[in-house]
Amino acid sequence: MSYASEVKKELTTLEVHRENAKAELVALIRMNGALGLANRHFVLNVQTENPAIARRMYQLLKQFYDLESELLVRRKMKLKKNNLYIVRVKTGVTEVLSDLGIFDGMQLLESVPNEILDDDMRVRSYLRGAFLAGGSVNNPETSRYHLEIYSLYEEHNQVIADMMNRYELNARTIVRRSGYITYLKGAEKIADFLSLIGATTAMLRFEDVRIMRDMRNSVNRLVNCENANLDKVANASTRQIDNIEFIDATVGLGQLPTKLREVAEARLEHKEVSLKELGDLVPGGPISKSGINHRLRKINDYAKQLREEATA
């Protein structure tokens, strides 16, 4: 089961207050519902590929309304092999939709009822329903952090983004294919949203994974930094040894002042040690790291001078 499916499965098991559950139902119908006609009466079909969501819709309708409804299963015959689950309401459709505030007498409304927009818990429930209907979230263990909700209508898409941004989630919108996307990118924002809609267990798992990933990334950065420093030290040491050997081969180390000669001889004898360790090994030491570095720069400058004279 994918992480997104785990989130949705958890959400379908939540027990919520009646009016808040209605707000969730509004989102599910608003986003996945379609009206049809049969014998001059409206028929409502709400479809999903997720059986747990289908059961949730069916149970909510049964809980709130005494009407004839059924749960149908259709096998997709094209590329996708998932079943399609349809909750069908044959009677009392106009009364149900009017009670939910999403029907104008002829069609489903694109707007969200003010009764939902004006209540914090109903907003959270609506967002839960919207995620169940059209949401997805990447697995935090294997991919970049990304959560999105798909909607067919631009106005409704913007309402979802505005709802999210009441909670400072920095939701953004884009156009994709034949619809619109509201999305979140930051790990903390996604965790906040999961908590907001009631997916507490999924949120805790998400946070555990995020913390472990951050720790691994920090360790990798430290290792890379340490490796870079080691490479830098090794390259500097190689350059120093090359220069000292060049001086020795051309004029001899005896031409160096005593303090420089002692450092040069110590470096030739101890090629792998750090500057700090080299300072402890010089006969006239111990010498500080900066002191050793200063003398080695003078040796490098002298080698450069000799090379220039040799090519002049």
Curated annotation (Swiss-Prot):
What is this protein's name?
Probable cell division protein WhiA
Q: What job does the chain carry out?
A: Involved in cell division and chromosome segregation.
Q: Give the gene that encodes this protein.
A: whiA
Concerning HAMAP family, the annotation shows: HTH_type_WhiA
Q: Which NCBIfam families match?
A: DNA_bind_WhiA
* One Gene Ontology term of the molecular function aspect: DNA binding
Q: Which keywords does the record carry?
A: Cell cycle, Cell division, DNA-binding
* Superkingdom of origin organism: Bacteria
Note the DNA-binding span(s) on this chain.
Answer: 274-308
Reply yes or no: does the keyword Cell cycle apply. Answer: yes
- Which species is listed as the source? Levilactobacillus brevis (strain ATCC 367 / BCRC 12310 / CIP 105137 / JCM 1170 / LMG 11437 / NCIMB 947 / NCTC 947) (Lactobacillus brevis)
User: Pfam families this protein is in?
Assistant: HTH_WhiA, LAGLIDADG_WhiA, WhiA_N
GO annotation terms (biological process)? cell division; regulation of sporulation
InterPro entries found in the cross-reference section:
Homing_endonucl, Sporu_reg_WhiA_N_dom, Sporulation_regulator_WhiA, Sporulation_regulator_WhiA_C, WhiA_LAGLIDADG_dom
